[in-house]
Amino acid sequence: MLKGGMLSRWKMWSPQYKILRNHLINFKSVSTYKNISGVNTKQPKSPRQFGCMPHVTKKRKYKYEEGKTYHGFQCERVEHISEFELTSYTFRYERTGTELWHIDRNDSNNVFSINFRTTPFDSTGLPHILEHLSLCGSQKYPVRDPFFKMLNRSVATFMNAMTGPDYTIYPFSTMNEIDFRNLQHIYLDAVFRPNLAYFDFLQEGWRLENKDIFDKQSKLVIKGVVYNEMKGAFSENAQVFSQNLLNNIFPDHTYRHVSGGNPLEIPKLAYNDLVEFHKKYYHPSNARIYSYGLFDASKTLALLDEEYLSDQSWVDNSYSLIRQQERWTQPRLVHISSRLDNMGTTIDRQNQIAIALLMCDATNIQESFELHVLSEVLIRGPNSPFYKNLIEPNFSGGYNQTTGYSSDTKDTTFVVGLQDLRVEDFKKCIEIFDKTIINSMNDGFDSQHVESVLHNLELSLKHQNPNFGNTLLFNSTALWNHDGDVVSNLRVSDMISGLRESISQNKKYFQEKIEKYFANNNHRLTLTMSPDEAYEDKFKQAELELVEQKVKLLDEVKIEKIYERGLILDSYQKAESNTDLLPCLTMNDVRDPPKWPKLFIQNVQNVRTQICKVPTNEITYFKCMFNITGLSHEETQLMPLFCNVISAMGTTNYNYREFDKHILLKTGGFDFKLHLIEDVRDSKSYSLSVMINTHALNNNVPEMFALCQELIKNVRFDDSERLKMLIENYISYISVGVASSGHLYAMLGATSQVCDAGKLKSLLYGVDHIDFMKNFVHSTSTVDICDKLSTIASKVFNKDNMRGAINTTQSYEPSAISNYEKFLESLPTFGKTQTSRNIHYLDPSCQQYVMNIPVNYCAKALFTVPYLHQDHPTLRVLAKLLSAKYLLPVIREKNGAYGAGAKISSDGIFSFYSYRDPNSTKTLNAFDETYKWLRANQNVIDQQSLFESKLGVLQQLDTPIAPGNIGIDYFLYEVSQEDFESYRSRMLSVTIDDLQCAIENYFGKESMHYGKCILGPVNANLELETSHKWIINN
């Protein structure tokens, strides 16, 4: 039997760029953060975008009855959603009014979350810093940073904490009930009884401290984890633009503040203000509690009653209510500045514009849903009016990240934003926006275009999401926070039916909506942004002046106290915590993951085909891969662009508008991805393949294969104007937001110094790809690019270099195979070409990508052994141990970076990284001193830390898999169920002696093949401070 699903989740990151026409990105705020090892998390999607299409059934036996009380919780509402076999129970604790929403569902991935409505009244980042501090120790668990320590004492599939613009949530999920109860205790104690220690405030929030804490003569600077995090956030232009849009469209409101914290305002926060805020806003009366899955909810109710709520009483929480924004009588225009992005386009085009409209109250569920659909009709794909009028004229780099409909705030918003346009085109954009609204109001929409949007929504609801409980939580949080009806919000099929009926009865239904919400809406903000070459200098000067103002208020005694406090904090950070106070799973608590359905390998018309018969909710998933290793170097470098544009160019029989309409009416789209796959057995070779991924309802499978055949046989690259627009949008898209994923780009940059396969990865996915595309487009005419892509298309889709995979239901499998055979009959065959290349390893090297940002992203990569080597599981355990015991304490807690860690990829690249880091060479030195630290702290590697590190690996290995992705590891890497089980068994058998041997073998002497990389500001002393020669990429 073959196993599918884990390896692809943790292999070296390979970003696959998609043009924004394929999906809408909701209006985000800078104020949504992830509190795990540093990676920024996007705001949850609209509550209308999750997988449920329910039907309510009245008569059935329920576990809890309406009107009855269980452990102090009265059951107020019970509803069954039959299509997803879940039952919703709404409870309210009688003493405090705390609402608990339990979703009972036969799903092994159980979820729990405590939510609070936390409305900021300034931009000091108080709710965000409190989120960090709450997880730094509590009454029952007085351990420094139990949250991070629990990461490796649990097999949680998800652990997090997030601050939104008006809420803070603390969610986790796990498939193990003992783990679930352990984490419930940790989270509940953290939020209701946190220690809120002053020195944790200094570490996580902000502090004034000597730059060198051991030198009292060194200058005073501002430090702090959140402070550095927000410096990083405010250096990202997309974040700055989104945050200002939120602040300015709600100017009289809590949303005018930055809940995450403006770095120049954070140092105004006083510790006592944070303590008082917790008392008020983290009161149980202001809490909402969510649980999901198959674990017994009565145990949760009993725990809350007995340990946290019974000694509390109700308080009026109206102080946290979010009122509606008062509507404007006149539209407004706001202009802001941003940093010059040296990764971006030319300075004259580094401008952005957004036109935003305030829509309806988010709690008006049907109205909000219909506006969401209308928004998709207006902006989605080449058949939408805004795409036709704003994107296709090609005076910008396409939609920006704010575009779309958002229901994440009390009043919903609709935004159309463009990036990379000239200042003189701002006026043109506004005029086109107005004209498009008027024309849409007068002319209406093509009925097939509307139907394609609704079909795509209905198809998305059929997906079986392995993280359904988390998805439901995130998509309900904002609505629930505004006291909206989250249960009725699950009735998406009813909302779709209601909309269809309204449209059938009134052909101008959408046109009337446009008149009301778009044409006659004075609450309209036009936000523009342009680069300022002095932006970073101005920030540095403002930061310097802020420090100077604070220093002026200090006498010598206070300065001495700051120095002494820094030493005390250093000792506090180095002190050992009694982690025995924290719960931890034992090996007896760890269960084997479920075995996945058998994979059948068949030869279908000489094409190796993998078939998995599994319940898929009436969807058939199809993947096929074409080996393209034989392409030339230039053709290979063009493959990411090829994958991005191929389904947007049209075919011999359909122009691009017609083809897009057919795709959306019959399938979930065609996703082309480029895969560089190393041999996981010996790392001596690699191959390149392009994978096509699509899915459709079973009754649309014939059309799915027909459209796929049409695309790969008849794609046209003869429309040079169309391609020019797509290329410019693509370059804008990949150039924006490099810093937000800076640690990933840094790891790719470091890996590119290790071997030629790593160098190719950087050319295909990294900063080097951005540079290549800019230079290539500058030196090559669009007509020539058309010819090159057309040549690639004639080479890529070779049946002799193909393999396929089908996941479908057992009953539909014969029909799926029959349609697949017809698809294969027409594919061209022109003999096998080169299928692999040998890997060559390089001499050690270091490089920096210079970015004008105030933080760094550092990485070091070295070659070890690949996935199926016997030492790989040991090194993976070691990576977890180093992250928890060395890198996070030193680089995050002590030195102030937002995140740090170590990981090993399937090809054997062992990487160290930091995220939003105030340091560069100091961090690289910490990476280099790993062996020295391990030898000096051998006592750290004990049985408990070893076991905890294994649990951290199990979290990744045992992650649930969607039915459509079962078998993916075998399809990509030929890692079988037996291989996986052997790997898992070897990992669990790793001993302390194994770790010590691995330390000596792979870190005891400097690796022959390693690379270092920094993304960050200029450092004139880089070579002097590191004693290495550096390649500087400006």
UniProtKB/Swiss-Prot annotation:
Main subcellular location: mitochondrion
Coiled-coil blocks: none
GO molecular-function terms, A-Z: metal ion binding; metalloendopeptidase activity
Cofactor binding: number and manner: Binds 1 zinc ion per subunit.
Gene3D superfamilies: Metalloenzyme, LuxS/M16 peptidase-like
Cofactor: Zn(2+)
Keyword Metal-binding among record annotations: yes
Subunit structure: Homodimer.
PANTHER family reported in the protein's UniProt record: PRESEQUENCE PROTEASE, PRESEQUENCE PROTEASE, MITOCHONDRIAL
Protein name, as recorded: Presequence protease, mitochondrial
